[in-house]
Amino acid sequence: MNVAIDFSKCPRVPGRAYNGANGKKIAVCYDHSVWMLKFPSSAAERPNELSYSNSCLSEHIASTISNIIGVKAQDTCLGVFVVGEKTRVVCACRDFTDGGKVFYDFCSVKNTVIDSDTNGTGTDLDDVLDTIDKQTFVEPVALRDFFWDMFVVDALLGNFDRHNGNWGFLVDANTRQVEVAPLFDFGSCLLPQADEKIMRRILDDKAEMDARIHLFPMSALKKDGRKISYVDFVQTNRLGVLERSIAKIVPRIDLQVIFNFIDQVSLLTELQREFYKRYIQARYEALFVSR
């Protein structure tokens, strides 16, 4: 089993800061690279919202699964960080802008399409696809393929917060070469609000499991003003580009390989291991087996 890394003594990297609503983030130097440490949100930070105490676990597990099935995502590892008298679980994410690259999120690129009537934050599916076709950062056909690959990954992992600010492009500051950035920000996957009591209830009650596959979480993308249901959309749509992504990615989803990885993740309880494995299997079967 992998051993959790203690990042407490790693030197902080000056001049690096990261945005985002879910938890604190700092940059440290570890193993000769820059890593962003993501801390789970505390109740004091989000007093009116559900706890995201498992978001760091979700970030690492989901990012690694994306890489396992061949859709490039950030490199991550789990660790701990001592804050005062408390030891916090953190997810370390390798900073893919290290080395002179600049990240532009899709929201910013969407704002460059000046003949669009919507702003950068809009997540209407047709509008997003229209922007993909009109943007000039990368070749539109290749970006459409990437977008639907990302959709398939998010569907498998139950990501309810893939918005225009957490995917995008890397531009080399020297050569101006542009590439699609690795996928990141997976903290809203795999039911991060579920504590062990909720996990046990979901495992013991098929109706509870089914609700968290067919009713929620939904995609942040919208169709006709309503959030898209992952299962309904995958089951009923035969869009050529989505079909290509499914045909490409689903054969790579080896559940036993994923389960073996989860068994090696440090800091998980046995209940959490069982939950993540059964939840991923249930989503996989609902999305892809019965098509």
Task: Kindly give the residue locations of the regions a language model identified.
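Aromatic-acidic/polar surface patches that form glycan- and anion
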Residues: 54-56, 142-146, 269, 273
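ATP-dependent phospho-/nucleotidyl transfer catalytic cores
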Residues: 94-151, 259-266, 286
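A short, terminal or domain-edge coil/loop segment
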Residues: 2, 9-11, 126-140, 195-198, ...
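C-terminal catalytic region of ATP-dependent kinase domains
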Residues: 67, 172-291
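Conserved ATP-binding subdomain of kinase catalytic cores across diverse folds
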Residues: 1-115
